[in-house]
Amino acid sequence: YAAPGIYTDVAVLDVASMHPTSIEQLDLFGEYTEKFSDIKKARIAIKRKDFDAARTLMGGKLARHLNDTSQAKALSNALKIAINSVYGMTSARFENSFKDPRNIDNIVAKRGALFMVELKHAVQEQGFQVVHIKTDSIKIPNATPEIIAFVMEFGVKYGYEFEHEETFSKFCLVNDAVYVAQIGWHAEDESKVGTWETTGAQFQHPYVKKFLFTHEPIEFDDMCEIKTVNTAMYLDYTGLDDTPMAFAKTLNSNLQKFVGKAGKFCPVKPGAGGGFLLRQDKTDLQKFAAVTGTKDFFWLESEMVKTLKLEDQIDQKYFTRLVDSAVAQIKKYTNDIQSYEWFVGADTAREVEKLAA
């Protein structure tokens, strides 16, 4: 569930180990459920640095692995892999010891999903808005201590334990998978306050994220794009009369340079040795089309750009287009109070204007 828009003071509440908890509540493994529960409890205890409790679980089997607590995170991750693997087996398409043949529609995931629907309605009945729900988390804008406590108490009724991990001071939700947010409060790491969290390729692009949000220095790697195809990629120089002779020698009879199924490229200015980045058609090998996201620009392998010291020939217009596109997404949801300038900051807004000039 997603309600795209810009919001403030958005509490992020996550269920701790939702699917494993659902397995417990359903008693899915009968007499063996308790053993599974111990693994889950041990993982949560380690995650919360309650090592004394973790040492007593699973018959004390983990105690010797916690003598060096610096290895605790690795142990927690190992337990997480085991837990998630068991959950995956409960809904696998093949027979196995963890799958009940009556479980034809993933009862574990269904219990969690139905709970989140119930929670959404319950929060709305309290007079609060719900703007984003994922598998095991809910986001509530303008959240108060009372509504946070309500969510946690509601979870207990169904056997779930919520954790209030962070609150976003600013939150722009584009769709159910893409958002950008500034952290206003964090439960475990105060240094994260004021930093930006992004999801989705558009806002996670390093150039866009740094330019609009984090303001870290732009580095060479930020101006490189990794492209992959299932067939083959070529740099095509057809019709380009300004191709340097050094590059022309590497071309085939069709004025193309084979670069493989994957590669790292930079957009470069006309005349800098770049070509059109094309992918070969899967069925018609004589047919080519622009690799996704590369149309209208010339491209050169990033290694070549660096070797020939052509960094100053990187085409900034490509990155301006990326920034402008991200800005346009944010502006879709702004208003007189929650303006674009307010969201990204007045200084950043001015830099974007300079970029477009």
Question: Model segments located where?
Answer:
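Hydrophobic, Leu/Ile/Phe/Ala-enriched alpha-helical segments that form helix-helix packing faces
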Residues: R43, L119-V123, F150-Y158
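Helical catalytic core of nucleic-acid polymerases
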Residues: Y1-E118, Q124-Q126, P141
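Beta-rich nucleic-acid/ligand-interaction surfaces
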Residues: S137-P145
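Glycine- and acidic
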Residues: Y1-Y7, R48, D52, L57-S70, ...
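Glycine-rich, histidine-containing beta strand-loop boundary motifs that form or position
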Residues: V15, S22, H132-T135, H164-E166
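Glycine-centered loop/turn motif at secondary-structure junctions
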Residues: G127-Q129, Y158-G159
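C-terminal, non-catalytic extensions of nucleic-acid polymerases
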Residues: S76, K80, A113, P145-A357
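Composition- and surface-driven signal marking solvent-exposed, interaction-prone regions
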Residues: I23-D27, K134-T135, F150-M152
